[in-house]
């Protein structure tokens, strides 16, 4: 099992390119099921989750070709299997995103209940509620969501909570439904907007994406299209937290600063110097960061996917920060591992109190989920001595060659196998 060996204490300097967003790429790949014509996607990140999605689509009969430049060409003109099996779904919750497209185009689907990061229940009940409102008959059978519909019919749907994957699933189902669908309490995330922009290129009629009310007028069929996946705002934020904790001066190319308002505001508050252009961000930190608190919220609030990384920065900051996790339960599993590095953190329910220390010291730590992995890497970069991060398969689910990019910025970080660390 691979690990990351980090020798901390070196500031980060230089520039790297931000990859395409994982949370946009996954639903966009699943949207290939909505048409028999080719879909050409650029800026698709090389991640375990995108590879798993491509394997899942391939199992269904979707043909996919991946080029070295991040371009993926998909064609779903020979789909012969409408089931998403447990062995593929168990590692990735986003695999539920095939449900809406399969049901909309083929009238049936059998999708295993999903897995993924162990950071809360994240139930699929809102997906089921919305698809049922569109006329689907849905049952849970032997661990599978089994759905059938002759043709979906437009409806007004208000989810009980804001759900990103729920909005995406219902959006993909609604584009081929008969009549008009209104999604109330819809997610506003840039990744939802990116999916909608692709669907519009494919011939869908969508208005209001980026607001909490999306209106979809269904069409009979969609056609092929060419689309570039939006830049990953979480990867960009992670690298900026890293330079905030370790110090230095970095530039991120291919970024989307207009999607990162809440994160950039927090980093400025922490003492980073931030400069932005249309597709780049420069972040510099000279000296010790200031402690900065945050409350996670749906977009455009501070993203739950940035909570662990900000906490890692706060561990070496001057002062005390209070972080409140409002989106997921059980999303403080990185705290125990940060404390192994010398962090001073107390947890009370959904609230974490982080008292900054002058220095962390390297140790062996274990990743528990995707963003927790990133927080441990950030802490390792800021720590004195050597840090060994175990179970980095979590990191590989959502970061495209993170250690390669960090080395390009001057970090002392290497991927090693279990044998090399024995």
UniProtKB/Swiss-Prot annotation:
InterPro entries per the UniProt record, alphabetical: Enolpyruvate_Tfrase_dom (IPR001986), Enolpyruvate_Tfrase_sf (IPR036968), MurA_subfamily (IPR050068), RNA3'P_cycl/enolpyr_Trfase_a/b (IPR013792), UDP_GlcNAc_COvinyl_MurA (IPR005750)
Binding site for UDP-N-acetyl-alpha-D-glucosamine: 93, 122-126, 305, 327
GO biological process annotation, one example: cell division
Gene Ontology molecular function terms on file: UDP-N-acetylglucosamine 1-carboxyvinyltransferase activity
Residues recorded with modification 2-(S-cysteinyl)pyruvic acid O-phosphothioketal: 117
Entry GO CC: cytoplasm
Active-site residues, Swiss-Prot/TrEMBL: 117
Keyword Glycosyltransferase appears in the UniProt entry: no
Functional pathway: Cell wall biogenesis; peptidoglycan biosynthesis
Principal cellular location given in the protein's record: cytoplasm
Cell compartments where the protein resides: Cytoplasm
Signal peptide segment: none
Pfam family, one: EPSP_synthase
Record NCBIfam families: murA, PRK09369.1
Family statement drawn from the similarity comment of this UniProt entry: Belongs to the EPSP synthase family. MurA subfamily.
Entry function: Cell wall formation. Adds enolpyruvyl to UDP-N-acetylglucosamine.
Name of protein: UDP-N-acetylglucosamine 1-carboxyvinyltransferase
Organism: Bordetella parapertussis (strain 12822 / ATCC BAA-587 / NCTC 13253)
Taxonomy of the source species: Bacteria, Pseudomonadati, Pseudomonadota, Betaproteobacteria, Burkholderiales
